[in-house]
């Protein structure tokens, strides 16, 4: 096994050059499932074990095609709206969170709800509620229409404005420039978010920061790992679905950090052999909603093309685990 290339950890080296000639893969670590996704997927699995099929899930539990298809085969039924769930049935809310109106709709239909919202998303919801109570204008940096943004904005619709990107700052107006705070979607590009905030602060100099980082640890860690390996890569392959915000951001980060090309794939079969023409070093990573089996498939496919040497590039070690929703926790013995 080639040596692990550590970066960002005490005693780590500061270069990804591993001294290996010929074709190779640099494999980002950390990658794949974050604690919130792991919790959400296990929530649906446990609900199916406890209650049997069907278990309804509002929106995709996480933004990954393979995960959704696998759970659907096991008996999960994915719906877009609460009124698609039969009265009295079990419904799981996705990791992205929902607006308070959705809880009201569910109660009106006598639904048995299991909330799989990521605790880090819940934190942003609570911040929105808190600052709305204090009558702040809340500038929510995030992608208009994304489920997480819809849910967070729904906590305080009269106080929240969504700021989609740095160029959207020009259109932002507030009631009192001395009473403004920014919050963010948890899965954004750190660099683009900071550029948006920089422009907001130019416009509103007393803009307040969130009490703590809103962009989640896993999103940041995966972007840092890609930045570490991308300068050494002619190609970076990101395993993830097109509707996964954090996966799409990894493609952007790879290109911005120096990779000649970067592509998003759901499966190994999506790799176009022409991408590999003239390529010596391929970087591989995966979004926070991607199971490791899909990454292994990509590595196997690359090995078929001669990229059998795999060097991990480690920038962080993740140990965080979130407790399951109380409705499906195992009974204590």
From Swiss-Prot:
This is 4-hydroxy-3-methylbut-2-enyl diphosphate reductase. Keywords: 4Fe-4S, Iron, Iron-sulfur, Isoprene biosynthesis, Metal-binding, Oxidoreductase. It catalyses: isopentenyl diphosphate + 2 oxidized [2Fe-2S]-[ferredoxin] + H2O = (2E)-4-hydroxy-3-methylbut-2-enyl diphosphate + 2 reduced [2Fe-2S]-[ferredoxin] + 2 H(+); dimethylallyl diphosphate + 2 oxidized [2Fe-2S]-[ferredoxin] + H2O = (2E)-4-hydroxy-3-methylbut-2-enyl diphosphate + 2 reduced [2Fe-2S]-[ferredoxin] + 2 H(+). Isopentenyl diphosphate binds at residues 63, 96, 146, 244-246, 289. One of its GO terms (biological process) is dimethylallyl diphosphate biosynthetic process. Binds 1 [4Fe-4S] cluster per subunit. GO terms for molecular function: 4 iron, 4 sulfur cluster binding; 4-hydroxy-3-methylbut-2-enyl diphosphate reductase activity; metal ion binding. Catalyzes the conversion of 1-hydroxy-2-methyl-2-(E)-butenyl 4-diphosphate (HMBPP) into a mixture of isopentenyl diphosphate (IPP) and dimethylallyl diphosphate (DMAPP). Acts in the terminal step of the DOXP/MEP pathway for isoprenoid precursor biosynthesis. Its cofactor is [4Fe-4S] cluster. Disulfide bonds: none annotated. It is an enzyme of class 1 (oxidoreductase). [4Fe-4S] cluster binds at residues 34, 118, 216. Its EC number is 1.17.7.4. The active site is at 148 (proton donor). (2E)-4-hydroxy-3-methylbut-2-enyl diphosphate binds at residues 63, 96, 146, 186, 244-246, 289. Dimethylallyl diphosphate binds at residues 63, 96, 146, 244-246, 289. Pathway: Isoprenoid biosynthesis; dimethylallyl diphosphate biosynthesis; dimethylallyl diphosphate from (2E)-4-hydroxy-3-methylbutenyl diphosphate: step 1/1; Isoprenoid biosynthesis; isopentenyl diphosphate biosynthesis via DXP pathway; isopentenyl diphosphate from 1-deoxy-D-xylulose 5-phosphate: step 6/6. Belongs to the IspH family. InterPro entries: LytB/IspH. The keyword Transmembrane does not apply.
């Amino acid at each position: 096994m080639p040596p692990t290339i550590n970066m960002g950890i005490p005693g780590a080296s500061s270069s990804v050059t591993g001294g290996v000639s010929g074709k190779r893969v640099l494999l980002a670590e950390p990658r794949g499932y974050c604690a919130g996704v792991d919790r959400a997927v296990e929530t649906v699995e446990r609900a199916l074990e406890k209650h049997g099929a069907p278990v309804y899930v509002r929106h995709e539990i996480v933004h990954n095609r393979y995960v959704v298809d696998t759970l659907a085969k096991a008996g999960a039924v994915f719906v877009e709206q609460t009124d698609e769930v039969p009265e009295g049935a079990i419904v799981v809310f996705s990791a992205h969170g929902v607006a308070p109106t959705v809880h009201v709709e569910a109660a009106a239909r006598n639904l048995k709800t299991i909330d799989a919202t990521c605790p880090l998303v819940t934190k942003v919801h609570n911040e929105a509620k808190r600052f709305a109570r204090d009558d702040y204008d809340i500038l929510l940096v995030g992608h208009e229409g994304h489920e997480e943004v819809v849910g967070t904005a729904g906590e305080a619709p009269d106080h929240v404005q969504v700021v989609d990107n740095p160029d959207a700052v020009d259109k932002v107006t507030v009631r009192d420039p001395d009473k403004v705070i920014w919050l963010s979607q948890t899965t954004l590009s750190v660099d683009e978010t900071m550029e948006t905030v920089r422009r907001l602060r130019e416009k509103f100099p007393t803009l307040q920061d969130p009490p703590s980082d809103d962009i989640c640890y896993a999103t940041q860690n995966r972007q840092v790992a890609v930045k570490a390996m991308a300068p050494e890569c002619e190609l970076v392959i990101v395993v993830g679905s097109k509707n996964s915000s954090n996966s799409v951001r990894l493609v952007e980060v790879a290109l911005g950090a120096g990779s000649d090309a970067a592509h998003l794939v759901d499966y190994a079969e999506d790799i176009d052999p022409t991408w590999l023409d003239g390529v010596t070093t391929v970087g591989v990573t995966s979004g926070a909603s991607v199971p490791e089996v899909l990454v292994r498939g990509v590595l196997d496919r690359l090995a078929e093309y001669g990229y059998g040497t795999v060097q991990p590039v480690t920038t962080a070690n993740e140990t965080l685990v979130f407790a399951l929703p109380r409705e499906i926790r195992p009974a204590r013995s």
